[in-house]
Swiss-Prot record:
Similarity comment: Belongs to the TRAFAC class translation factor GTPase superfamily. Classic translation factor GTPase family. IF-2 subfamily.
Span of domain tr-type G: 499-671
Residues that bind GTP: 508-515, 558-562, 612-615
Organism: Corynebacterium glutamicum (strain ATCC 13032 / DSM 20300 / JCM 1318 / BCRC 11384 / CCUG 27702 / LMG 3730 / NBRC 12168 / NCIMB 10025 / NRRL B-2784 / 534)
Biased composition (Pro residues): 184-196, 219-236
Gene3D superfamilies: 1.10.10.2480, P-loop containing nucleotide triphosphate hydrolases (3.40.50.300), Translation factors (2.40.30.10), Translation initiation factor IF- 2, domain 3 (3.40.50.10050)
Pfam family, one: IF-2
Designated name of the protein: Translation initiation factor IF-2
Biased composition regions of type Low complexity, renumbered to the chain: 62-157, 173-183, 279-303
Region (Disordered): 36-393
Main function: One of the essential components for the initiation of protein synthesis. Protects formylmethionyl-tRNA from spontaneous hydrolysis and promotes its binding to the 30S ribosomal subunits. Also involved in the hydrolysis of GTP during the formation of the 70S ribosomal complex.
Amino acid sequence: MPGKLRVHELAKQLGITSKELLATLKDKGEFVKTASSTIEPPVVKRMQEHYGSSGSDKSDTAAKPAAAKPAAPKPAASAAPKPGAPAKPAAPAAKPAPAAPSAASAAKPGAAPKPGVQAKPAAAAKPGAPAKPAAPAAPSAAKSGSAPKPAAAAKPAFSGPTPGDAAKKAEPAAKPGAEAPRPGGMPRPMGKPAPKPGARAPRVANNPFSTGGGERPAPRPGGGPRPGGGPRPGGGPRPQGQGRPGGQRDGQRDGQRDGQGNRGGQRQGAGAGGPRPQGGPRPQGGSRPQGGSAQGAQGAPSQERQGGGRRPSPAMMPPTPGQMPAKAPGKGGRGGQAGGGAGGGFNRGGGTGGGAGRGGRRGGTAGAFGRPGGAPRRGRKSKRQKRNEYESMQAPNVIGGVRLPDGKGATIRLARGASLADFADKIGADAAALVQALFNLGEMVTATASVSDETLQLLGEEMNYKVQVVSPEDEDRELLESFDLQFGEDEGGEADLAKRPPVVTVMGHVDHGKTRLLDTIRKANVGSDEAGGITQGIGAYQVKVNVEDTERTITFLDTPGHEAFTAMRARGAKSTDIAVLVVAADDGVMPQTVEAINHAKAADVPIVVAVNKIDKPEASPEKIRGQLTEYGLIPEEYGGDTIFVDISAKQGLNIDELLASVCLTADAELDLVANPEMDAQGVAIEAHLDRGRGPVATVIVQRGTLRVGDSIVAGDTYGRVRRMVDEYGRDVEEAGPSRPVQVQGLNGVPGAGDNLLVVEDDRIARQIANQRNARKRNALAARSRKRVSLEDLDSVLKEHSTLNLILKGDNAGSVEALEEALLKIEMDDEVQLNIIDRGVGAVTQTNVTLAAASDAVIIAFNVRAEGKATEEANAEGVDVRYYTIIYRAIEEVEAALKGMLKPIYEERVIGHAEIRAIFKASSVGLIAGCMVEDGKVRRNATVRIIRDGNVIAENAKIVSLRREKDDATEVSAGYECGMVLSYPDISVDDKIEVYEMVEVPREA
């Protein structure tokens, strides 16, 4: 079978444009998308008929007959071809003789014979013609469109001649394609020629595999034998849509269904219908077997075909309107007692006489192209159709012309710094629609940019969604759960748990003696090494002390007391078991003391108060107890539960008593146990970049045992433990619970306070670190992004004074503390502080290059520039500031910000004068003769002219000033002068107020 034609190919054959052909197809009910779409052969044939194409064009889509091998004889029921399917012709057979024409062939086109009436042949029937019925009747032609009268079906006398007889009596037929001679010498009817087949009703579907192309052949009226008509116009094959040839299958099925005798009727004779394709002698010289009656169909098999091949399908034959039953107007459905007139829709159905006619049925593939045929009926709607109709009934959620989905109160969980693309994936919407909707709400963002939490929640409320931004803790927990990891829980049962030393954090105000206390306990001197005598980092030590003749191990954390190290104190409180609050007896409760109390209470950590410096004469321990009572720390001697110990760190007084109190609190209030056999988990309390060792993290192991060679992940850094050292610089191979160690081997400097976790291999550690890093960047981008509305766009584009800084420090905690302290500086909106980069380690050339490009200042805290960074900074003019004490860096940055502020000016009145007379001069105009009443009048000063208490001129200038005939710079009170003003509209008795704008220094 040749390939299917496309729309543009058929249009080229027909000599029209593709657009015209598409329009015609649409009018005919064939819905084809584009000019490149393929068309089924029946539709091609219809279009060719519609546009009057030549026969050569039609031959492209017709099924070509091909020779087939002779098949074994089969029963007639199985030999009948399927309706609508092209049948291959048999091998060359005997040319059939034409059958005798009946009266029906001479009837008008569209006329249908009455049921039960068989036309009498004009001459003796040739072999192969249909047999004469038992009760012949005169032919009567019905008008086109009239319904035939019901009558009982007449049974034929016999089924027809045998194939052998038909072969003997057959006459030579004309060549294929030529017109066959009319039997009996009957002349051709002289009526009007058969009309050319025109356009038919739209097909049900463009499907070549449907039964009969979506149509059902009409039954023959009366069930009698088919009239032996002459050759059809053009001598073509059987027209499409004619009655099904009789046979066992048709007779049996239709006879049983309708209760009629011979629904299928006799099969057309061998000679009827013109010559066979590739006309040759039929094998064994037989004609086609005739269709039997209902009894024969049900009781005995029909005669077998001897030809072995199938005849052409009705779907392959052109229509013959002259022999087609007329269509009755009206709707389809089952016919009545009147023989079931022609069916509606696309079928030409009709029942047999005396029975209920079968109406038109739907096409084989209903709904493929256009509405199905037959009578319209209400079917069940699909779920999708119902859902679409329901959603269309709902009020659309439209924001600024953009249709968005309605959340109906659903909850959406998004990570920090999520983008609109992430939001769109969650709700199944288009990211571009969300961008446009947010633009209409006054926010300008892209689909992939990180969006702040407030913006996500605002957009969610507009779409009726509840947006929950996942907290950092939940986000990290979900990340670890995706790798089947957990942090913060001991593995195993209680039998696997063992006691661990307490972790004690020393907290308090600056210069109250925290580091001196630890020095006394460790019998070392650490405070002398600190810059400025203050602690600027967390120190972790593990010492062994004798408490009540028992050696106990205690881990101490020394936190800074300066106000800039709030985050460090909070981190120390979270990593500890017991907090020792150091308060100087001669100083009292200070702001950082109160802050330390709040941190300890927030972490639910028991507090032991150490009242220090009791050796000083002005010390008042009782005063300290009274002050701390206001903050909920009630001494035991006052009936409370807080232990107070009076000590002197400098002289070493009562240190043992303090350690005993710490151990007593740990034993009484805390159950300090951990599993030492599990994979290690801990916290990085400090981290820095060492010149020779690389990134170094100070870690406290909270549970498990950390060993050299373990794969670890700390925050957004990962690596393998290459070396561990204790607080004395000695190498250790493993570290158990509550043990502080310095870990080397990470790929970067972790953040202070990041959790440390041992994982199975480096691959998992790298994946966790990379995902944490990506989330951290998104959150930072969302937080640092400024919300710019359309109304504020003009003001944002104006130039602002911005101080760009690059922070470098010796460890992560110092950089964090410095950044937080700088961001807390309160300044006006006209000056902004922007920290563009931060890092741990020396100042590098990369930092200098970035500073030069962004006009930034580098703040180096406890680090210096390395290599050629200093030379490059001098060449580029980059300002690098070095500091060793954090509060000095804060003070200088604050002063620099204040210096960038625009000056504040204040108006100051310097004198008043009154116009007494006005003179005119051609060269200068009006001259005001004035008397200075108070103050001074200066040349080029700014004046305000007042008339009758109303200001008539503002910001006028004294252009010229004279005293007598001499020019004067200023004139004092009590003197007359003449002046020329820049404002010409002056009059006598006007008051002149002279003032100047003076810069006022800003308050510190």
